[in-house]
Amino acid sequence: MKTAMLIAVLGFCAALCFVESSHEEEREAAVYLTDLVSKAESAIKRGIPCRCDKNSDELNGEQSYMNGNCGDGWKKCRSVNAIFNCCQRV
């Protein structure tokens, strides 16, 4: 949850920087920050490897960032925290 909140705050800051920038160099920095935020968001949504079994070191699932829904073709194997689930392909 901390990661998602941080990304949301960074996204807001990037948008604010872009709107408030008066120099080309500031605009370039805002565009760069916006690009980093979008890449971070897609990395979270795409899935980070996770363990379905707490007692195993095998990364046999992917984290899902869809409020408890793993999506079509996936099944939930473990809750990681309040936002993320560890999901496996069916």
UniProtKB/Swiss-Prot annotation:
Its annotated compartments are: Secreted; Nematocyst
Q: Name the InterPro entries for this protein.
A: Myo_ane_neurotoxin_sf
Question: Anything else the record notes?
Answer: Negative results: has no hemolytic activity on human erythrocytes. Has no effect on the shape, color and configuration of cardiomyocytes. Does not show significant effect on the calcium currents.
Q: Which UniProt keywords apply?
A: Cleavage on pair of basic residues, Disulfide bond, Ion channel impairing toxin, Myotoxin, Nematocyst, Neurotoxin, Potassium channel impairing toxin, Secreted, Signal, Toxin, Voltage-gated potassium channel impairing toxin, Voltage-gated sodium channel impairing toxin
Q: What is this protein called?
A: Delta-aiptatoxin-Adi1a
* NADP recorded as keyword: no
Which organism is the protein's source?
Exaiptasia diaphana (Tropical sea anemone)
Write out the GO MF terms. Answer: potassium channel regulator activity; sodium channel regulator activity; toxin activity
The family classification in the record reads: Belongs to the sea anemone sodium channel inhibitory toxin family.
Q: Where would you say this protein principally sits, based on its record?
A: secreted
Q: Which residues form the propeptide?
A: 22-44
Query: A cellular component term (GO) from this record?
Result: extracellular region
Record-annotated disulphide pairs: C50-C86, C52-C77, C70-C87
Signal peptide residues are 1-21
Is DNA repair given among the entry's keywords?
A: no
Please list the coiled coil stretches. Answer: none
Q: Which SUPFAM superfamilies match?
A: Defensin-like (SSF57392)
Q: What does this protein do?
A: Cardioactive peptide that acts on voltage-gated sodium channels (hNav1.5/SCN5A) and voltage-gated potassium channels (Kv). The activity on sodium channels consists of inhibition on sodium current inactivation with no significant effect on current activation. This effect may be caused by direct interaction of the toxin with sodium channel site-3. The activity on potassium channels consists of a significant increase of the amplitude of the transient component of the potassium current, shifting the current threshold to more negative membrane potentials.
